[in-house]
Every structure is written in structure tokens, then in C-alpha cells.
From Swiss-Prot:
Catalytic activity entry: Release of the N-terminal residue from a tripeptide
PANTHER family cross-referenced by the UniProt entry: PEPTIDASE T
Subcellular location: Cytoplasm
GO cellular component terms attached to this protein's record: cytosol
Record-level Gene Ontology MF annotations: metallopeptidase activity; tripeptide aminopeptidase activity; zinc ion binding
Catalytic residue positions: 86, 179 (proton acceptor)
Family under the similarity heading: Belongs to the peptidase M20B family.
Cofactor note: Binds 2 Zn(2+) ions per subunit.
Listed InterPro entries: ArgE/DapE_CS (IPR001261), Bact_exopeptidase_dim_dom (IPR036264), Peptidase_M20 (IPR002933), Peptidase_M20_dimer (IPR011650), Peptidase_M20B (IPR010161)
Protein's name in the database: Peptidase T
EC number: 3.4.11.4
Originating organism: Haemophilus influenzae (strain ATCC 51907 / DSM 11121 / KW20 / Rd)
Enzyme class: hydrolase
One of the GO BP terms on file: peptide catabolic process
């Protein structure tokens, strides 16, 4: 078990990391998309050097890499640990003011001095957290547990390994920028991250072990109109907003995020922007099954073609589809040790593994596309990307315990 001083260190690390404003910018053309990510990267470089890691580097893209050699000649495997620097652009991450609740007694939690609160009426998982120390927001920003809890857990595990001289395998560490917008991982230096397999520490509830994720793409549909004074518009105006609203009606009403779960895919209208003369709709396309994923992309393409044929527009609507990431399972299944080791580590510290698909993506999906198996491990956090985000300190401790147990590389 982790000592009290280590629990304090873990909390202090987390509170320090969330003080960095690292929100990524979705329309950025370069990485890192925000200055704060580089600042946090430089801070982590300094701490990794202090912990005695080797080859600690920060690239111009704010990718942090480091290496800790095995301290036991019998432990020859190399395991990677990955977490990301940025926070979601979907909710403000500036001036995060965490609040620590010792021994949560149940019931609603008021956030700051405003009207925001977290209630077990809406979030049933809170009933499992009674008696634990919770870190919440003040109701004005997200918390940043996604993924600074993961960073704090990795750093604390490394600190304990070094202080207590615990036998461990070779360890590679990477902290990446712009995971939330799928940008930074494209600048990942694979040549500096040679390992047998790796883990992203980017999951949620205690026990989560994830090695299947969505296939993902983004579709942008552009509509072009013609504006004229409304008093004289008959037979002359073409309203791009109206065209876009009509097009949106072709999508299946039940195949949306708010009506699907498990391994069921969806279309998600993420953004609707523009005016009478030009509108752009942005859709997220998600599915676990590769064939269904291809069919979803074909569906949008076919609907655009039908819409253009039906309307006979002088300037037809345009479609752009960009793949984001792929399901990692096809790679992970060929490295079953990556799942077995995480399973054994959780059981060794009294945690029941919960294998579940990720209804999203991680940096591990990209690493898998490069041939590196990279399952995802829990952080103890909940309600990511929102003002209701929270993390359990005990859950974070559990993650540290699992990381240390995995790095012992027993029976490999």
C-alpha cells in the first residue's frame, strides 16, 4: 500500500499540474496548439531528470520522452507509459480552482459559490465514492483529471520505484500534446519509444481496462447560399442555413451519442456554423466494426450526392471526410501479454478488472496503428470534459499501485 506521505505527494503533484492552462485549440494547424502545454512539458522534463530518468527530452512539438533502465537483469521487457498534456477544448481549462473534499459523506456536492452542483441523482457512481477524498471543480471550468491525473500517477509511481528501489523492468515514458484534438500524436517520435508494449493512463473508473476503441472520422459538409434583402427575396434568395437544416434530417434519429452505448456507433453533429451565404456542418462518425464504419462514411457521401441531385444547386454542397483513428484491438489481440499483465496487476492489489470498450479514442489507438499494442488503464476520474469532472484520490492511489505492480513484470 502507498504510505500517507506518498498520498500527499500524489495530491500535490495533481494540484500542481492542473494549475497549468493546457487547453488545446481545435482548429490549430501546429502542435502544441497552446503555450501552456510546452510549459507543462518543460516542468515534467525537469522533474523526470530529478527522478533519475535518462534521455529526458522535449521535442519542439512538446512531446516528452524519457527512459528508466531496469534495475534487475532478469527483467528484460520494456514497458511504455503514456499520458497527454492537454485538456479538452469543450470546456474551459483556464484558471482551474480545484476543491478537495475529505471523506465524502454522500449527497450533492456544491461547486464553488455558483449554482453548479454534482448529484448522485444524476451520477449514480457517486454512491461508490462515499468515504473517499474527492477533488472537484469550482463549477466554472473542467478539472483536468483527463489527463493530468494520469500524469501525476505516472510521476508518483516512478518516484516510489526510485525511492524504494523496487525491482522493475525497462520503462519508457511519454507525455504527448493535443490528444484531445488528435493532432500532437502525429509528431510522436516512435524511434525514441521502442518497447514491447505500452499503456495509456487515460481511463476512468477504478478497474477499467480498455483495448477496443471506435474507428473514428470527421466529416465536414459545406453549403452555399445567396443573400438578398428579405423584402425582395422571393425567387432570388438561397438560404444556406435552410439547406443545412434540411440535410440534417436525413440522419437516423436513434444513431446519436445520447441514444447509443456499448459497441453501437453513431453520427454526431458537433458543430453548425455559418450564415445565409455559407454554412459548415461538422459530423463525428464513430463505429467499432470496420465494415459498419465504412458504411457510415459511404452513407454521408451518398446523401450528399442525392441532395445535390435533388436540389440542382448552381454551387453544389461539398463534402470532406478525414479519418482520425482506428480500433486498436487488431493490434492488441496479437500481444495478449499486455492485457494479462494489467489483469494480474489489478488483481494483485485487490482490484477487479473491468474490460470494456472505449467509446472514444486515446493516443494508444495511434500507437497501435504504428504496430505498438497500447491498452488503456483507469485514472480514477469521472465526468471528463465538463464542469462536473472529478477524481477520487483513492482511485488515483489504486492506479499508482497498478502501475508499480505492472512494472515489476512478474512471470514474464
Amino acid at each position: 500500500m502507498i504510505s500517507q506521505i506518498d498520498k500527499t505527494e500524489l495530491l500535490e503533484r495533481f494540484l500542481h499540474y492542473v494549475s497549468f492552462h493546457t487547453q488545446s485549440k481545435p482548429n490549430a494547424k501546429h502542435s502544441p496548439s497552446s503555450v501552456g502545454q510546452m510549459k507543462l512539458a518543460m516542468q515534467l522534463q525537469k522533474e523526470l531528470i530529478q527522478l533519475g530518468l535518462e534521455n529526458v527530452e522535449v521535442s519542439k512539438y512538446a512531446v516528452v520522452t524519457a527512459f528508466l533502465p531496469a534495475n534487475d537483469p532478469n527483467l528484460t521487457k520494456t514497458i511504455g507509459l503514456v499520458a497527454h498534456l492537454d485538456t479538452s477544448p469543450q470546456c474551459s481549462g483556464k484558471n482551474v480552482r480545484p476543491e478537495v473534499i475529505e471523506e465524502y459523506r454522500g449527497g450533492d456536492i456544491a461547486l464553488g459559490i455558483g449554482e453548479e452542483f454534482i448529484s448522485p441523482v444524476y451520477y449514480s457512481f457517486m454512491q461508490k465514492l462515499v468515504g473517499q477524498t474527492l477533488i472537484v471543480t469550482d463549477g466554472t471550468t473542467l478539472l483536468g483529471a483527463d489527463n493530468k491525473a494520469g500524469i501525476a500517477e505516472i510521476m508518483t509511481a516512478l518516484s516510489i520505484l526510485q525511492k524504494e528501489n523496487i525491482p522493475h523492468c525497462n520503462i519508457r515514458v511519454a507525455f504527448t500534446p493535443d490528444e484531445e484534438i488528435g493532432l500532437g500524436i502525429h509528431y510522436f517520435p516512435m524511434e525514441k519509444f521502442s518497447c514491447d508494449w505500452a499503456y495509456t493512463i487515460d481511463g476512468g473508473e477504478v478497474g477499467e481496462l480498455e483495448y477496443e476503441n471506435f474507428n473514428a472520422a470527421t466529416a465536414k459538409v459545406r453549403f452555399f447560399g445567396r443573400n438578398i434583402h428579405t423584402g425582395y427575396a422571393k425567387g432570388k434568395m438561397l438560404n444556406a442555413l435552410t439547406l443545412a437544416c434540411e440535410f440534417q434530417q436525413v440522419f437516423p434519429v436513434d444513431e446519436v451519442p445520447e441514444k447509443t452505448d456499448g459497441k453501437v456507433g453513431f453520427y454526431h453533429l458537433e458543430d453548425f456554423s455559418g450564415d445565409i451565404e455559407q454554412v459548415e456542418l461538422t459530423y463525428l462518425i464513430r463505429d467499432f466494426d470496420e465494415q459498419n464504419f465504412a458504411q457510415r462514411k459511404a452513407f454521408i457521401k451518398n446523401q450528399v450526392e442525392k441532395f445535390n441531385a435533388k436540389k440542382g444547386l448552381k454551387k453544389p454542397i461539398e463534402l470532406e471526410i478525414q479519418d482520425s483513428y482506428q480500433n486498436m484491438y487488431d493490434v492488441v489481440k496479437n500481444v495478449p501479454q499486455s492485457i494479462e499483465l494489467a489483469d494480474r496487476a489489478m488483481k494483485a492489489v485487490g482490484i477487479k478488472p473491468n474490460h470494456k470498450p472505449i467509446r472514444g479514442g486515446t493516443d494508444g489507438a495511434f500507437l497501435a496503428s504504428k504496430g505498438l499494442a497500447c491498452p488503456n488503464i483507469f485514472t480514477g476520474g469521472y465526468n471528463f470534459h465538463s464542469k462536473h469532472e472529478l477524481v477520487s484520490l483513492q482511485g488515483m492511489e489504486n492506479t499508482v499501485q497498478v502501475i508499480i505492480e505492472m512494472l515489476k513484470c512478474k512471470d514474464l
